[in-house]
Each structure stands twice: as structure tokens, then as C-alpha cells.
Amino acid sequence: DNLRDAVAKLGEISENEKSGFISLVSRYLSGEAEQIEWSKIQTPTDEVVVPYDTLAPPPEDLDAMKALLDKLVVLKLNGGLGTTMGCTGPKSVIEVRNGFTFLDLIVIQIESLNKKYGCSVPLLLMNSFNTHDDTQKIVEKYSNSNIEIHTFNQSQYPRIVTEDFLPLPSKGQTGKDGWYPPGHGDVFPSLNNSGKLDTLLSQGKEYVFVANSDNLGAIVDIMEVTPKTLADVKGGTLISYEGRVQLLEIAQVPDEHVNEFKSIEKFKIFNTNNLWVNLKAIKRLVDAEALKMEIIPNPKEVDGVKVLQLETAAGAAIRFFEKAIGINVPRSRFLPVKATSDLLLVQSDLYTLVDGYVIRNPARVKPSNPSIELGPEFKKVANFLARFKSIPSIVELDSLKVSGDVSFGSGVVLKGNVTIAAKAGVKLEIPDGAVLENKDINGPEDL
């Protein structure tokens, strides 16, 4: 009740946000964030996770395709900042390739789709209070494009002080640090609260494709799930549980089963967070307040104060939709850029850029991408760019490990397994045009 009273007095947020927050906290306190009963988990069958190649092909007829696409809306989750990569502002404005940002590529893709089929697929961006102002300025540059861009904000919830369970903003924390965006599970109520859902339904739109703005593989094609590789061991997976399909995230796994959860044998698929959802169903479920997704408690510290933020994931909503299925899609549908090592992949000759689509180079024989580990010297985008005169050729690379003060000249070719480790205090420069194949380099003498 103290929390309820304190929240009621917060002037910065709407009544919808207040009631949404209070109901999330009530669910959390009633023990709904409980972990799952491990023995009840079953691997989903092909009926609920459908193999991609068994899907019916889209109609050949252009008019039929146009009619389908005219019912579609693309929604990108744009609430994240580029802080982990050393950038201020929205992550979607990091330059990915040829000077284009994530957002540029998304706009170019939808433009070419609209042009090709004569359709009008709009783009929605769900911002957070962290990215809203910057995004509003950035989208102005697309005002001449053939694409309608709508933005709306996801909810802004107060962080809870762990000690006395009161909102941080009512304890004198006036800045942004007092608040948090409650995860992308919030996309459904926020789409409704913003009025955008009703607008889209009134325009005859029927489906929304939801994806992370940093997943370059999330182009308009068809919830998708892809074969798990070792890089994805922490990602959520789809399971059958008490007769329904649901998303299982690592936060819900009992400690003694975490290693089993990470195993590629038992859980072969993971959630790409590419979701295809019926807009009318969203409206019906949001109005009925039926979307009670699993709560993920995320403990943080703000200026030495321990706080709690309660979050939900969009994919977890799958169990509230009747007849929901997963689709096991090719790896190409999941090309996320979470770190500069991913940036190295997408800026290299492993990919080309066509109509805003990042497409894999057919010259790459192996189906999987090389594994890349870069040391902390490469963590920030600016430092990463400064250490490469040009991005090396990695079409024949299996793995690369770089540590220490290393920089690369132009036209470098890396093949097989390459490890480069500069000793402390030593600056190691890989010369222009160097070809390194299955090499261990610890100093200039090894080049």
C-alpha cells in the first residue's frame, strides 16, 4: 500500500503506466515469478515448432503478394542505447556498413519492398524514454521516403528500492536513473495505450512483425526460431509445458539446471525475438488484461543503492495466443550486432549489402560464421574502428582471438585459426597485406 500511494503521487508518468506498474508488482509479490518445474518440460514437436522448409511458398502473383503485404506492419524495438559499445544515443544509429546505420538499413529494406510490390508497409519504432528524443530528430531525415514511420514510447516504470520497496524517484532520485523501461514484453500494452493499435486496425492492418532493431537478419520474411550455436547458449528457447508452447528464459531456470539449459543437445533452438502477431488478437488480449508474461526480476545498483526492476519478454506472450507456433528458421534470419566482434563480421567480406539487406557471401563454404573474440581494447566502436585500417578478409577464417594493443593494416587476410596476443606494454601492428593462416602471434618476430 505504501508503494501504491507513492506511485500515485509520481507526476512524470501516465495513469496507464501507474496501473500497469502496480499490477506487475502485485503479480511479482504474489509469487508469480516462480521458477518452472523442470520435470514438466518437454521438447516441442514439429507441430509446434515447424521446420522452415515445410512452409508453403508465398504466392507468385504480384497482386496477391501486394494484398498480403498491405495487411502488414513492421515494428522494431528501438528502446536500447549503444552504451555497451561505447556509444551515446540509440543503438540503432550505430553505423553498420557503408556508412549506413541499423535504422537506415531498415528504412531502405521497407522502401524497396513497398516499391517492388506497390504496397504500403509502415514502420513503427517503439522507443524508450532513453531513446525517444534522439529518435524523433533522426527520423526527420526519412521524411521524403515512400514509407510511413510512426514512433511511440514504451512504458516508463520507477525502479524499486530493494530495502523498503518504495519507488526510487519518490526518494529524491529526480533524473533518468530513477526509471527503467520494463523489457520488450511491454510492446503489446504500449502499442495499445499509444493509440497506434486502433489506428492500424482501422487502416485494415492485420499482422505485425516485431523484431530487435539490431538483428540484421530480421527482414520481412516469416516467431522464428533458429538452430542454436555455442554463441547463443544464454538465449531463450521454446518448450512444451503443460500442453502449451512457451518461452523459457535463463532467468526462470533453477540454478542446478542452468548447465543443462545451455546445452545444445537438449535445447536445440533459441528465440530470435522475431515475432509475427495478429493485431486483432493483441487488441483482444490486452483489453482482457490476459498477457501475464513471466516476470524477470533484474537487480541493479544506482549510486550505491540496490534497486529492482521487473521486466517481461515479448516472446513469452506466445502461451496466451491460441494455436501459436514457432518456426525453425535458417541461421541467416538471426544476425544480431551486440558487440564489436559482430560488427567485424558484418563489415567484412563475409557479407555484402543489397537493397539494405546484409547478405552472406556465397564464397563462404562453411555454414557457420567464424568465432571472433576481441580484447577490451576493441570494445568501444571508436577504438575498434581506429585499430583497423580496413576490415580484414575473413571468408576462410574459422576463429580469431585478439588480445592486447594490436592494430591491423589494410588488406590483411585471416584464414583458419588465428590468435594474436600482444604482450603487456608492447604495440603489435599487423602489416598491410599480411596473410595469416593458422597462426599464433605473440610478437613482431612471429609475423
Question: Where do the model's predicted regions map?
Answer:
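Left-handed beta-helix
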Residues: 1-70, 220-447
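Conserved N-terminal catalytic core of the sugar/cofactor nucleotidyltransferase
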Residues: 1-73, 84-91, 95-207, 396, ...
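Conserved short loop/turn motifs at secondary-structure junctions
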Residues: 9, 122-131, 213-216, 331-335, ...
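Beta-strand elements within well-structured catalytic alpha/beta cores of enzymes
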Residues: 74-78, 209-211
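Conserved adenylation A10 loop of the ANL superfamily
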Residues: 78-84
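Short His-Asn-centered micro-motif
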Residues: 96, 125-129, 154, 211-213, ...
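Conserved core of the sugar-phosphate nucleotidyltransferase
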Residues: 133-279, 283-289
